[in-house]
Amino acid sequence: MGIRFYRAHTPGTRNRSVSDFHEITTSTPTKSLTHANHRARGRNHSGSITTRWRGGGHKRLYRQIDFRRDKVGVLARVATVEYDPNRSARIALLHYQDGSKRYILHPQGLAIGAEVMSSPEAPISIGNALPLVNMPLGTEVHNIELRPYNGGQLVRAAGAVAQLVAKEGGFGTLRMPSGEVRLVAKDCWATVGQVGHVESINLTLGKAGRSRWLDRRPRVRGSVMNACDHPHGGGEGRCPIGHPGPLTPWGKPALGQRTRARKKYSDALLVRRRK
């Protein structure tokens, strides 16, 4: 992937950068693998806002991604690499030997025409899926399951990669992109390689309107709100927040306060917290 930079012809193009989409091979998704996507816009079933600063983005078709990789033992060929508006990563269309088609996350370096497979005996090559117990130490993986046969849930964003650093007992030890080191059952499956589109983190939106296209609404600071709307609000002009430390809109400590449950079930699986 490459990055294309705009000249500053207008304030909206100054500092703006976009992907050059050179890895994309088709602009039309496979119709049988797409469906309409009802977007919640940050609301729950009753219409109340449960996630702030969401809504108003461009309409999208949802691409059905195969996170389970459960066609075991069937060889597949990479047919296309496509854009997916629902995630930062690219997706690859696989044509299986039995005639079926599925989308997967596109790993870095997986070329058109390459063959991939999901199997416990699959070789350690980019795009193949197999259990952690069959991988050598040091293998870089993505799309990792938390529970066996539940489908990949970890390490799915563009450029993300985890590393298998140990295997002991019934667990494998993974170093996550955040720096966290955690245990995952050795029977869980993962895909070999790093998620593609690694330069995604270096893209600059350049203008507020581009955030709106992506379903992101303005994030207003609490200090400029009224006192009835936020603990930091109120006062004459710009003034201190009036509290020993920053607070959330609901009056709880913010910015550095640990919010993870003290007795969470997965505490026993965390070897080292994220950085």
Curated annotation (Swiss-Prot):
The keyword Cell cycle does not apply. Residues 28-53 are annotated as: Disordered. SMART domains: Ribosomal_L2 (SM01383), Ribosomal_L2_C (SM01382). GO terms for biological process: mitochondrial translation. Keywords: Chloroplast, Plastid, Ribonucleoprotein, Ribosomal protein. One of its GO terms (cellular component) is chloroplast. It is found in: Plastid, Chloroplast. GO terms for molecular function: rRNA binding; structural constituent of ribosome; transferase activity. This is Large ribosomal subunit protein uL2c. It comes from Nephroselmis olivacea. Belongs to the universal ribosomal protein uL2 family. Part of the 50S ribosomal subunit. Pfam families: Ribosomal_L2, Ribosomal_L2_C. Transmembrane segments: none annotated.
